[in-house]
Amino acid sequence: MAKETTARSILGYQTLPTTALIALIYVVAFFSVLVSDQLPSIPHPGSKKLKGFDLDLARRDLEHIAARPHPYNSHANDAVREYLLNRLDDIAWGKDHVHLDNDLRSNGSWASPKYGVYFEGTNLLVKIDGTDDDPHTQIPRGVADGVLFSAHYDSVSTAAGATDDGMGVVTLLQLIQYFAENRQRKTAIFNINNGEEDWLNGAHAFLQHPWANLTSTFLNLEGAASGGRPILFRSTSLKPVKAYDDVPHKLRVRHPHANVIFSDAFARGFVRSGTDYSVYTGIDRHGPAAEGGLLREGLDIAFYKGRSRYHTRWDAPAYTEGGERSLWSMIDVARGVGVGLLNPEDSAKQKSKPGVYFDRPVVLALLWAIGAVLKHNAGSPPPPPKPTVPHSANNASAGTGRPGASTRQPTRSFGSNEDANSERGILARIKSVSVKNVLITVWKQASFWIALIVTVGLQALLAWGYVAINPFTIYSRPYFVLLSFFALSFFSMTLVLQAAFPSSPVKHAIEVREQEKTTILLHLHLLSWIALLLSTILIGKSQVGSFYVVTVWYLGIWAATVIGTLQPILVSKRADDKGKRRARRSRSASTSSSSSSSSSSSSGSDTETERPSTQPASERTPLLFGRANGASNRRKTNSKSKEDGAIGWWIAQVLLTVPPVVMLVGQITSIVLEAMNQTLTDGNSAWSIYLLTALLATMLVLPVAPFSPKLHRGLIFLSAAVFVGFTIYLWVVFPFTRQDPFKVFFQQTVSLDREDVFPMNATGNAVTTHGPKIVTELTGNPAYLRRVLPYLPSSREEDITCSPHEVRTGLETCRWKSNRLAPFPGGKDPWSTWDSDAQRTTTDVSFFKADVTRTAWASARFIVQGRNTRNCRLYFDPPEKSGVRVVRYVVHGGAKGMQPGYPVDLVNGVQEIRLWSRTWGKAWEVDVDWETPLGTGEDEGQLAGRIACEWVEYQSAMVDNGSFGPDRQPKIPALEEALTFLPEWVAVSKAADGLVEASAPFTVV
């Protein structure tokens, strides 16, 4: 008996064991998620993992590549390209199976629904022949089986590009060296492309190259943040994801990081970012070719943490999150996945189908076909039975179902009237059903749903409080915000359920708590079944894989509910068997002692009646003695201070319902917070982020609901204190820091007159009297943008106008005149007779020259030449304003026709043509055809718009190679002012491809 009491105090369904076990599960689950999210350490020198790699060389490569900003339209870009070309030439030298192509031939035109592009590629390509392929055979596209590895070496104009995409390029250099010395089965093609930051131009240029026809699978390396662990951003299907496992054990990725939630977010527009993945797969195609299926299967692997430093000066080697460990993590993942892609197991038998993938904390990645999830969900058990509140919840003295309780019906006394007793029993039960009892039953039945409604309502109210008071507090303290939501959810859920199921006055009534737990489990089962039904519909219609957690949640709840339903039956049967054994022992004991009892003296009998019998009661036990013994036992039981509780059953239920959900939801929560908390400055809605955090916090608490009546009340007070303390702190704290800065987007525009651009005389010199109109634009979230402007001296004495941004939803653009901070394009003026630009003023500096000639009634030729730039544009007024739409364009000297899958939209036309050249100061000749909308005459409408050129170079980011004299260095003083005077909690990024855009209007006459 003592052993049973000790075991019950430790393992019984009591307050302290339940609280301790659940608290331990949460601590272990959260700790495992945080530990698995840490960057792996770099292997020690001489490790087999490092064989074939040189991390010191990789670090030096990164320092060369990310020394300064190097966008496509910069001279620093040429320097990076030259460095990479020399490195690749050294690797390929003396190896016949390694082929290097310095691609300066791939030109092409392609269009999106809104704009058209002409681009001249400068990609660096490497082909390493596979052992199973014939290098002299040009394989048709239909049977192409090579693997494409891709990263871009250009950066944005405001960042050195350590993670975007310097680490990706350095990783490819290491892979080229590794695969050159360790040939794989398939052919590997590496596209170190240029122009990705200007809307994926380098990937499009690769499609123009013959080697593009040799690939069927790809691995794209990207950086959408500022370091940390690279994650599997998205995948076309499970087929390429299996590359994580199709590798020898010693090369396998030991710490994979993947979750299908990113792929779903990309597909539905929640992630405002684009990578070469969309070009290689062809998912962004339009027109007739859009229905042709995927061009290639593949994976997108990228960094995602620290987005506030993304595309800013803090994306540099010195500020990368994780430093060299982050670089090694990317190399390790790319090597493991690359080997798997190049050496697949039975690739011909593998089918391309969408799937579910996520990495379990501290374990390898898990794959699950969406079809299997859908099939399982469709075949899941039916909805649970209607929950019922056991009578013992209202009558604590009931003994039915309690271990050891007798189930024998009471014996009728001699001469009793059964019918009369039955009628009196029915009337007694009817009278006992009072309004109070009915209300108590309804309250207990509805308590879970009331708790859920209260919790959801309070979570929504808290989200409103954050959005209204301090919406950016999640920007730098996401886990504090999560803790605030979690504490409130736990407080409200537990408080309501403990009020519905208070502590029983008879603490040893085990069946009370067990059946209360089962009641809540049944309601939770119903909720999970509804969620499973909705997720099945979404999976079937939209192929949403992120609902895998609902399936896991439902399975755990279902199993725990089955245990709770079977427990009373099994316990009752065991109690009946135990009672029968006791009865047999009692009869045997009574028979053996009958002779001695009859010979006992009266005094002895009196003594025996005074001492309670230790034998169990039976049908032969004297009635009065049994009553006295029972009363004594009840008095002793009621005097006990120890809490009773069933052993074993509840532990299995806790392990089935709590750990799987907490670990999976905890991992999703960590990814969501790290990836989305700093997207507010990109224009994302604060409501969506806070409501999503509230939903995840509620899901973390829901598994505890069935056991909450047994949790220690101290946890309620603790959660209330945590909620109040952290919420007040988060509402008043300043949300931005140097590590998590507020991001603003910069651009300066120069509006030129027609005579500044179009030829006026033979020399091309056209001097204006009033000069250009120069405006500085700063774009950002309106909540803090206007607090930033006073830091800039040029804005203090000017009229500032602000309006919603035309493209970036949720952001605002403020403008002011800044002629005193006029930009200078740099280089030599090809149209001027002046010996030096130092002799000229800012009002007569030439930016570009252009000419427009009408060649037919609906055709014109544009000639554009920019000064010290490789990027110009043609803007056309929308059809609603001009009455015409541009339906065709051809650039002289470029490839004929449009890239397959990217034609001009003949219904809406193009409103912009972006021109990119690999040579400086090139003069583009562009033929344009237009149409008038249906129902208008040929003479109606007039093609008009703007001609513009872009510049991205400024003094603090220049390459000091002596190519420019002091009077010919490009300058953007307004940007230098922003970089100098803005506080440390503000970071500057580009607003468009050009930091400076000079434009002049045109009209085709």
From Swiss-Prot:
Cofactor: binding details: Binds 2 Zn(2+) ions per subunit.
Compartments reported by the entry: Vacuole membrane
Catalytic site: 196
Residue ranges, compositional bias (Polar residues): 406-419
Short name of one Pfam family: PFF1_TM
Biased composition annotated in UniProt, kind: Low complexity: 588-606
Single annotated GO MF: metal ion binding
Record topology, Vacuolar segments: 36-353, 470-479, 541-543, 666-686, 735-1005
Cofactor(s) required, per the database record: Zn(2+)
A GO BP annotation: proteolysis
Residue positions the entry lists as glycosylated: 107, 213, 677, 761, 961
Membrane topology summary: Multi-pass membrane protein
Family designation: Belongs to the peptidase M28 family.
Role according to the record: May be involved in vacuolar sorting and osmoregulation.
Name this polypeptide is given: Vacuolar membrane protease
